[in-house]
């Protein structure tokens, strides 16, 4: 036998069944000389795009198929013979998946009728299963085979005879199949482990579910010849020959119904663009902008993407009609057409951007437009898309959730029978998202013997499992919308969320096969900005503030930013950003663009940050390698900071076409994962030498490009974000009460909890008023104080566990008449005992019943009343004298119920004890010189570990005077893991570092002082 085609093979997209990736399977199939390989994951095409890419790489023909089992029916392998067969297969999988909950399927006999044209079927029967033969023959006339799967079992000879006899009785051709679950025999242990995981059993108890041997791998041709009759092997090639379908045959069209009569997509897009030009530039667009728009419209028309732009414009138009704040970002911000259509907010007159980063002729790939919407109202936009286009033509893309270190080791350890306490301890040795095996030192610290055979087996299998698909989840908002039913392109299944459906491919798969998507994303800052505008309009009336009407280039705003007074400000509120601000000292909008981008892995790893700062501060001359490149790098003082600059450099210095430059960008983004950047070294060097640049300069540029790795930040993305950075900064500087109030009402979002946001507001002299049923709404609100900044009234939403519907009833009853006492409140607002107890414990009844102790006593006599007796007389009881709660009791209750306090900061109450420990307050660090040893203590506000920090973690501590940034090196974090991860009140001994107005403490020793809090519930925001 010179060739063979495997017709039944599962990849690791048959979750917890297949033990090899498509790339591993096709690489081995190529080495073994297979003619073709079918990927037949169970009721799924989730992995088929990756299989298609692997098949092209290894030059082995891909057969597209799926394994299914009918409810109370036979098991089949279905293969797509042609495009019609592929579409039938997609529809069948969709029916089975939509009928069942996420992660499962139900296919019935009637789903195979009428006949599935273009689908070949292999019946995986047992000897003697004659009953289904005639029925299956009707379902698949001339397209049905009997599959013979032999795995060197003791009964192989009898099984072969029985199956051949069944084939003869049913008048069906027989064909060899492998039921392949792994590319090589060495994966058997992993396959056994995955089977145990799938069945929630340890391997030692999973015997009935495990395969008898390791034969379900891709076997050499010689081995197959010794197992199967030649005719059965030859039949595999005949079936492979009949399967002519290739994913390249898919024809995708974007919806066209948005175009009114009398127009085609091109003319309607031009009409809307012209309308947008008049709105964006009332005095007329410049010749430069006009030229750019004409260039873009011509290319959009040439590539046939008009309907895509119209669809995105329609979605954004809906949001604006509903007063939902939104903004396009990413590469779409490079487009003047997108700005004219209202999709993006970045004026091409304001910043010079590169359209080819978004769309190019050479790249021949669809554009990708990301639009951010208010996070609290995005669901309205998502349901609009579903309703406008229907479930048949719109669905979210999937995200392939993969195994990472802690999750993988937990599943493997359970499967190998480790007791629960050891499973937890071992998982804790691994970072949640880290894929590296824990060090021997870390294992020993946790009580494990690194030389233990069982432990080594667990870690070895974990290493194989890491990176495997675990399940499909839904993309946060990536929509695929089609002119034709989506299930003719890809199977569609239910998402875990109600009223959501997802396709089985993720965003990377879409790029490979040319499907367009629009990202309907959520951004908390947009919610906060809209809430700020609402609060100010309610407070003062007049013309409503908007993003467009915020005064630009305000010196007071930039002065605040340069002081790093940016808690709550979009993109520049992290400790790393705040440490950079006094060094960079932004003075204009483009400085903010750089600030947003510079504290990123790309510039840091490419060693671009310090040269830029030195040049900006006049400590190093600004130099350019040529006059031509001065135009490229002038805006960043000769230092490449953005992806677009790398593209422009390649175009100007090495004669790349715009499309080739974008291919360089894509290679740059993927080289750490897939390699593929080296071929650009020779191309860049050759082009730069030909244009008169020095070889060492070309080499240095290439190393900087590698430094960008997968983290190079797009200028368009930074510029879009900088718009929101400036808007939020302006609000914090000029309307701090409204901004803080809006942030709290929009929480969870950002780096800081409501407690830290309120502490910051108080440091800015903003008055904060307590939760009070006589005044509080559900949301926090503003209360005027003469000409000063208004006070923030805490809302009932601050009370942990309090229901919004109860708050709405309180508001409604209060509008009719003020409450006279607790009984009146409970009766007219219809509050149950639980709601009243929460209000009492939160101090929200102080105005009706007194302090917390009195309020608790008062509600003890409130009984829910039937309507018949609602207006009856009430017996008055004599007042009871109850003691005032102590300051400590008040503090504990505040944090337990509200997560914050309007009383003294917790550390103010502990300051005497902290002084006894020789801990300095944060304000004492201001006057101290660089290099001094210090001891500090504070509440842990958050822990951050940037991707570029080589294991460094930044811990933010807060005391009654402010915040301190603490740097914890990896070794210290490992040595003192418990106080590092678990402390809520942390003492740090270390060394003060001070430079350019930035201070932080390099930790040398950590100590957990949490017991001093005596039950105080203070929560940090960690690793988000």
From Swiss-Prot:
Any keyword Isomerase?
Answer: no
**Top-rank lineage group of the source organism:** Bacteria
**Catalysed reactions, as listed in the record:** DNA(n) + a 2'-deoxyribonucleoside 5'-triphosphate = DNA(n+1) + diphosphate
Q: Does the keyword DNA damage apply?
A: yes
What Pfam families has UniProt attached to this entry? DNA_pol3_alpha (PF07733), DNA_pol3_finger (PF17657), HHH_6 (PF14579), PHP (PF02811), tRNA_anti-codon (PF01336)
What Enzyme Commission number does this protein have? Answer: 2.7.7.7
The main location class comes to cytoplasm
Q: Which GO terms describe its molecular function?
A: 3'-5' exonuclease activity; DNA-directed DNA polymerase activity; nucleic acid binding
List the CDD domains.
DnaE_OBF, PHP_PolIIIA_DnaE2
Name the InterPro entries for this protein. Answer: DNA_pol3_alpha_NTPase_dom, DNA_pol3_finger, DnaE2, DnaE2/DnaE/PolC, DNAPol_HHH, NA-bd_OB_tRNA, PHP_dom, Pol/His_phosphatase_N
Compartment list: Cytoplasm
Q: Name one GO biological process term.
A: DNA replication
Keyword tags: Cytoplasm, DNA damage, DNA repair, DNA replication, DNA-directed DNA polymerase, Nucleotidyltransferase, Transferase
- Can you supply one Gene Ontology CC term for this chain's record? cytoplasm
Instruction: Say which family it is in.
Output: Belongs to the DNA polymerase type-C family. DnaE2 subfamily.
* Known function: DNA polymerase involved in damage-induced mutagenesis and translesion synthesis (TLS). It is not the major replicative DNA polymerase.
Q: What is this protein called?
A: Error-prone DNA polymerase
Organism encoding this protein: Pseudomonas paraeruginosa (strain DSM 24068 / PA7)
